[in-house]
Amino acid sequence: MANSLLEGVFAEVKEPCSLPMLSVDMENKENGSVGVKNSMENGRPPDPADWAVMDVVNYFRTVGFEEQASAFQEQEIDGKSLLLMTRNDVLTGLQLKLGPALKIYEYHVKPLQTKHLKNNSS
């Protein structure tokens, strides 16, 4: 039953490959991680830590979360805040429906955090 629930949740995942802001390489690595490449587009800084609240809102609008994007504005989530968010913050703090919240965290917030950490650890 748990597997069928998860399959249903992930069945309608928005493809991060079509991000206008990021040039995303969705090639799966051996460990299951995803490579993400960055480029400046739509006037947003390439580093999410430099995003203003409206950059975050526009990012989520462009990746298919039009309804949910307003929650980031209401909670005043800028790039630095976005990079600090935990799974629990996204699932409960934004008061979003569970399905979209899971997708937002797993396919957008988490990869942005991972990319940011990689770029700033060297």
Swiss-Prot record:
It comes from Homo sapiens. Residues 51-119 form the SAM domain. This is Sterile alpha motif domain-containing protein 13. Pfam families: SAM_1 (PF00536). It comes from the Eukaryota. Gene3D superfamilies: Transcription Factor, Ets-1.
